[in-house]
């Protein structure tokens, strides 16, 4: 059963219930001691497992989680694979935390199918699980809550921004991320559904996976540019490493600012590119809120309190016109505001 964002179109599968990276100075796997003890004197031990530990997005998730842990009296054990393509390592990490008998687990599954088994195992063992960032193909009682961006809507917003910049006409490319990633799959599907509403826009490539690193995305973008050349009027990249890779490829070809380029997620390089006119728009999540609400939800689940099945953390669009607004600056620089 596929766990979908709430605005996804009807599908012939059961919609579950209501139904997108380096941590700060901490190394992957380092425990964070936060907050005061609980009423019985026990400090909750919460495992938080991101998809990876090399992208800025996850640092912001971690930052928000620490804020909630400080308030709720919990220790966060933050650990994830170095690469977001390393499914086996994420499986090993969650299994280790299950064996360790932590009080609760927050998981961003990098594979919607493969991570279902250990999540079910954790539940059978009395360890509640909150899924964040990316959905899981599992029964509705396998986890306590899903904390995420409405990624389908984010893809739609990217398409609307692209169409506005193109004046409703042109040939565009969408670079996919990595097979098995539910969050980016939703962005991709949302983009394709929304862009189809513009008859003057032709999607000339949407089946290429750019991979989980900036380097792999740059290589794939170069291949697409080699194939289509001047035919490309616009490009949509569905996450931070892909967007940074596309940006580098466009800069190498002296095409930055000439091709309409919409990205998803943020980094310092992307924010600078938006200011300079090298990017047209950036679709932003609120990773700090995602981390914060994930810890809130897992603590409620541990305590046996009711938890909402889905917690929407919001989705926004940054442009040259609004980049200096308080809201966008907070999303671009969460640890500085």
Regions found by a protein language model. Name each.
Residues 1-6, 65:
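Positively charged n-region of N-terminal signal peptides that target proteins for export
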Residues 5-8, 34:
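Intrinsically disordered, low-complexity segments
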Residues 8-20:
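Bacterial N-terminal signal peptides
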Residues 21-337:
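A residue-level marker of the well-folded mature domains of exported/periplasmic proteins
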């Amino acid at each position: 059963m596929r766990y979908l964002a709430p605005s996804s179109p009807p599908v012939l599968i059961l919609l579950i219930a209501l139904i997108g990276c380096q941590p700060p100075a901490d190394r992957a796997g380092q425990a964070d001691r936060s907050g005061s003890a609980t009423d019985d004197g026990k400090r909750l031990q919460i495992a938080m497992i991101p998809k990876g530990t090399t992208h800025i997005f996850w640092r912001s998730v971690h930052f928000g989680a620490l804020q909630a842990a400080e308030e709720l009296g919990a220790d966060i054990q933050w650990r994830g694979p170095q690469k977001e393509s390393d499914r086996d390592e994420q499986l090993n990490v969650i299994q280790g935390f299950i064996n360790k008998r932590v009080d609760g687990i927050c998981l961003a599954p990098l594979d919607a199918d493969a991570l279902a088994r250990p999540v079910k195992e954790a539940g059978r063992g009395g360890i509640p699980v909150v899924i964040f960032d990316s959905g899981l193909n599992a029964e509705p009682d396998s986890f306590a809550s899903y904390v995420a961006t409405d990624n389908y809507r984010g893809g739609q917003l990217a398409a609307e921004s692209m169409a506005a910049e193109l004046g409703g006409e042109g040939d565009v490319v969408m670079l996919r991320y990595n097979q098995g990633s539910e969050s980016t799959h939703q962005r991709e599907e949302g983009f394709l559904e929304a862009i189809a509403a513009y008859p003057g826009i032709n999607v000339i490539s949407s089946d290429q996976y750019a991979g989980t690193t900036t380097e792999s995305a740059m290589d794939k973008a170069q291949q697409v540019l080699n194939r289509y050349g001047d035919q490309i009027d616009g490009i949509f990249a569905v996450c931070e490493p892909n967007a940074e890779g596309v940006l580098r490829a466009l800069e190498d070809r002296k095409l930055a600012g000439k091709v309409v380029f919409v990205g998803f997620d943020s980094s310092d390089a992307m924010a600078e590119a938006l200011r300079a006119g090298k990017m047209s728009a950036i679709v932003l999540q609120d990773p700090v809120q995602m981390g914060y609400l994930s810890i809130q939800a897992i603590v409620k689940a541990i305590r046996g309190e009711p938890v909402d099945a889905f917690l929407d953390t919001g989705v926004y669009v940054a442009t040259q016109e609004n980049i200096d607004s308080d809201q966008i600056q907070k999303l671009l620089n969460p640890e500085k505001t």
